[in-house]
Swiss-Prot record:
Topology relative to the membrane: Peripheral membrane protein
Family from the record: Belongs to the phycobilisome linker protein family.
GO term, biological process aspect, one: photosynthesis
Major site of localization recorded for this protein: membrane
UniProt xrefs under PROSITE patterns: CPCD_LIKE, PBS_LINKER
Domain PBS-linker per the UniProt entry, residue ranges: 2-180
Any one of the GO CC terms: plasma membrane-derived thylakoid membrane
Domain CpcD-like, first and last residues per copy: 234-286
Function in brief: Rod linker protein, associated with phycocyanin. Linker polypeptides determine the state of aggregation and the location of the disk-shaped phycobiliprotein units within the phycobilisome and modulate their spectroscopic properties in order to mediate a directed and optimal energy transfer.
Keywords: Antenna complex, Membrane, Photosynthesis, Phycobilisome, Thylakoid
Protein name per its UniProtKB record: Phycobilisome 32.1 kDa linker polypeptide, phycocyanin-associated, rod
Amino acid sequence: MAITAAASRLGTEPFSNAAKIELRSDASREEVEAVINAVYRHVLGNDYIMASERLVSAESLLRDGNLTVREFVRSVAKSELYKKKFFYNSFQTRFIELNYKHLLGRAPYDESEIVFHLDLYQNKGYDAEIDSYIDSVEYQNNFGDNIVPYYRGFETQPGQKTVGFNRMFRLYRGYANSDRAQIEGTKPRLARELATNKASSIVGPSGSNPAWGYRPSVDITPRKTLGNAVGENDRVYRIEVTGVRSPGYPSVRRSSYAIIVPYERLSEKIQQIHKLGGKIVSITSA
């Protein structure tokens, strides 16, 4: 059954009647290879992968029955390959958006999810950020140990929020599109929607909508705030920082201090703090 009557126009038709890809105990070699390729396709956002980039050791463990699909997904998400494609050159909030898409098959529901993962990464690091998705009850309930993650955001399931359907189309730009080949680049897609707790209208994939290339970057330019002014209705966050070392700052280690920023500038401010050599102690709602 089609996900919507407009499945062909929205680029979701390939998923409409697709069966879940699961690694069974009696799987043939061809079926195991299909699982491996499906994991690469989904977790790497349909981006091209060269033979030299494949995780040969993890693939071998999976073929020999010494690794579950879940652990293979973890290996891919923690690999240098994944970091090069989605972590090193992306805004941190964009990285979190993609983790939700790649590892849980949906878009973030609200900004509290983004803030939670920003804080988790700052305090516990990259591996803990990845583990938080794969070790979650949500992952276990939907994919278990041997089902390849898929796009749940196009379906209606218990526990899902309907706002996730619209937002999924800000992250998914068509079956043949990859997450590194989109016109908006490495910038976050959902910053404004999450900050205002609203969902935008659905825009068809880039190949099906001639006006797509002219879309304004509404998620990048603040609409309510100018300069240092914070609109009354904007949510703001408190970032506690310590240890800034940069020209213009005292050479003695600074004690902790806090700054207040609107949600839509959170990622930008975090990058600025890192460039100044600062360490983020916590991120909390102000």
